[in-house]
Amino acid sequence: MTKGGLGIAAMSYVVIDYMRYVSPVWHSRLMPVLWSVLAIAVVTRVLFYKHWSKELRAAIPFLGSIVFLLCALLFEALCVRSVTAVLGLDWHRETPPLPDTGQWFLLALNESLPGTLVEILRAHIIGLHHFLMLFIMLGFSVVFDSVKAPGLGLGARYIFTMGVGRLLRAITFVSTILPSARPWCASARFNNVPSQPHRWAQKYYVPYANDPAAIRKLLHWDAAYADPGSYIGDYRADWGSMSFLSEFLRPSYSEGSSWFALLKKAGGGCNDLMYSGHMLVAVLTAMAWTEAYGGFSSAMIWLFVAHSAQREIRERHHYTVDCIVAIYVGILLWKMTGFIWSAERKTKQTKLEKIQNSLIHAAKDGDIETVRRLVEEIEVSSRVEKQSKVISNRTMTVFACATVITTLTIVILALTLTSDG
C-alpha cells in the first residue's frame, strides 16, 4: 500500500460498494473478500509496526477528542429537535422553502446535459459512511508507512476538528430558524411535535410574522407589545433532573419516557441548516487524505465531495448555501488544527534550521560558548526524544492489542450508528 496501494484499495471499496445497486449478487461476493484481504494485510503489518511508542503518546489526545465529539453530537442532537419543535408542525407544513439558485441550476442542467451524465449525477455513488470508512482506511495505513505516524494522532485531529465543526454548526442553525427544503420533513420525522408554536414563539414571533406594520411598531418600541392571547400549554415530561429539557424538546405523552430515546428516534433533522453536517465530514476526509497521502486518489475524493454536494442540493436535503459554507468551514477548521497532527516531518535538520541565524551570528562574533550551547540544545532534545521512545515490550504489546480491538470496535459502532444518516 505504500506506493499507490492505499488509493487503489479506497477506490476499490467505493466501486464494490456501489455494485449493490448494479449487481447485488456480485456485491455480496466481492465485499467480504475485500474486507478479508484488508483485514489480513493490516493484522500482518501490525506485528512489525515500529511506532507504537508514538501511538501511546497520542492515545490520550485521541480519547479526549472522542469524548469532545460525543459531547458536541449530544448538543447538536438537542438543537436539531429543538429548532424544529419550537415553531410547531403547522409552521413547517405551511412555510415554503427558500428560493435556491443552486437547485434551479441543477434542474436546468438536467434539461441540457446528456441523459447518461444526469443519471451519474443522480446516482448514490458516495455517502456519509463511505467518507468515514475512507478516513478509517487512511488511519490504518500508518502500519504500511503510507501515512506519517502516529495514526491515533491523525485520528485525534480528525475527530477533534469534527467536534468543533459540529458544535459551531449547532450554534449556527439554532440561532436563526430556516424552513426546510423539504416541507414534509418535520411531519415525517417529528410527527408527535405539537402543531402550535412554543409559548415563546407565540409571544415573540407569531404576532409579527406576517404583518409589516406590526414589525415597524416592534422596531420603533423595541418591545413585544402585541397580546398573544391565551397560551396553549405543552406536555411536561418527568425526566428527573433532566426535566428542564422538556421545555426545548416538546415531547408528547407517548414519547416522553426518555429524553435520550427521544433524540435517537428521528434519524436526522429538518431545520439543521446553514451548513451541512454530511458535507463537513466529506470535506474533513478530503483534507485529511490530501495532507496525509496526496496523489491521484486525493483528487478523486475531492470529486466525490463535489458529487455529494450536488446530490445534497438535488435531493433537497440542504440548500446550496449549506454545502458551500460547509466546504470552506471544513477547510479552515482543518487548517487550524494542525497542532494536533501534521504531515510535516520534524527532524534534527528542522531543529538546526530554526537556530541557523543564531548560530551564524554567534560564529561571526566568535562566541564559542553560544555555539556550544545551541548545539547542546539540539543534542539534548534528540536524547529526550529517544528516551521517550524506550517503553517495555510488554507494555507495547498490551497497548497494540487494545488499540487494534478498540479501533475496530469504534469503526463498527460508527458505521452502525451512521447507517441512517
Swiss-Prot record:
Membrane topology, record value: Multi-pass membrane protein
EC number: 2.7.8.-
GO cellular component: membrane; plasmodesma
Function: Catalyzes the biosynthesis of sphingolipids with very long-chain fatty acid (VLCFA). Required for the formation of plasmodesmal cytoplasmic sleeve during the transition from type I to type II plasmodesmata to modulate post-sieve elements (SE) unloading and symplastic cell-to-cell molecular trafficking at the phloem pole pericycle (PPP)-endodermis interface in roots.
One Pfam family linked to the record: PAP2_C
Effect of disrupting the coding gene: Enhanced plasmodesmata-mediated symplastic transport through the phloem pole pericycle (PPP)-endodermis interface due to a defect in the formation of the endoplasmic reticulum (ER)-plasma membrane tethers during plasmodesmal morphogenesis and associated with pores lacking cytoplasmic sleeve.
Annotated GO MF terms: phosphotransferase activity, for other substituted phosphate groups
Top-level taxon: Eukaryota
Native organism: Arabidopsis thaliana
This protein's UniProt keywords: Lipid biosynthesis, Lipid metabolism, Membrane, Sphingolipid metabolism, Transferase, Transmembrane, Transmembrane helix
Annotated gene: PLM
Biochemical pathway: Sphingolipid metabolism
Similarity annotation: Belongs to the sphingomyelin synthase family.
Major place of residence: membrane
Protein name (Swiss-Prot/TrEMBL): Protein PHLOEM UNLOADING MODULATOR
Cellular compartments annotated: Membrane
Entries under InterPro entries matching the protein: Sphingomyelin_synth-like, Sphingomyelin_synth-like_dom
Top-level EC class as recorded in UniProt: transferase
GO biological process, one term: very long-chain fatty acid biosynthetic process
Transmembrane segments: 30-50, 60-80, 124-144, 158-178, 286-306, 323-343, 397-417
